[in-house]
Amino acid sequence: MDRTGIFAGDDPFAIAAGWLAEAEPQEPNDPNAIALATVDAAGLPNVRMVLLKEIEAEAFVFYTNYGSQKAVEIETSGKAAFVLHWKSLRRQIRVRGLVEREEGVQADAYYASRSLKSRLGAWASEQSRPLASRTSLLAEVARVTARFGTNPPRPAFWGGFRIRPLEIEFWADGAFRLHDRFRWRRNSLSDGWSIERLNP
């Protein structure tokens, strides 16, 4: 298989991390933005942009409110998919897999690294629920600010999700739409990867 250059390597997570590092100085903003897809109880899909915060040895990690629609749908199905696309590189990565919570010291550390206003905002926002007005949201921010001051703890309802892929596809633009695509697949998390080139 002619998997060379930007596609070379035996570790898909290392390839993904390398592509992200290459995109960071070139992409206009949020090179780590992913379009995260979930499905509701009726099987109707939802998709939204979130920020990918970590690429681990065997997983991709993002953070959110556990009461949000995305979190509820993830915990109902145990699955999610996302695409990471860079116009500057003309490349993308597609991921499908199983999801688990990250709510330990790793989530604490990421929460602590956020700006104070973002940490307070996590307390103030009942994400995805109806909101009477922006004024009421700002009033809640003021209330939690008075309660916690400059050291709000991580809320129990806020933390990470770790996506453990069963499938990762690397795509790069080619002339005349003759794109290069390589798909890594495994049947379970304990299996090794099989790799195949796909038609554009």
Swiss-Prot record:
FMN binds at residues 48-53, 63-64, 70, 92, 127-128, 171, 181. Pathway: Cofactor metabolism; pyridoxal 5'-phosphate salvage; pyridoxal 5'-phosphate from pyridoxamine 5'-phosphate: step 1/1; Cofactor metabolism; pyridoxal 5'-phosphate salvage; pyridoxal 5'-phosphate from pyridoxine 5'-phosphate: step 1/1. Its cofactor is FMN. Its EC number is 1.4.3.5. Binds 1 FMN per subunit. GO terms for molecular function: FMN binding; pyridoxamine phosphate oxidase activity. One of its GO terms (biological process) is pyridoxine biosynthetic process. Keywords: Flavoprotein, FMN, Oxidoreductase, Pyridoxine biosynthesis. It catalyses: pyridoxamine 5'-phosphate + O2 + H2O = pyridoxal 5'-phosphate + H2O2 + NH4(+); pyridoxine 5'-phosphate + O2 = pyridoxal 5'-phosphate + H2O2. Coiled coil: none annotated. It holds the Pfam family PNP_phzG_C. Substrate binds at residues 53, 110, 114, 118, 177-179. Homodimer. PANTHER family: PYRIDOXINE-5'-PHOSPHATE OXIDASE, PYRIDOXINE-5-PHOSPHATE OXIDASE. Catalyzes the oxidation of either pyridoxine 5'-phosphate (PNP) or pyridoxamine 5'-phosphate (PMP) into pyridoxal 5'-phosphate (PLP). Belongs to the pyridoxamine 5'-phosphate oxidase family. This is Pyridoxine/pyridoxamine 5'-phosphate oxidase. The gene is pdxH.
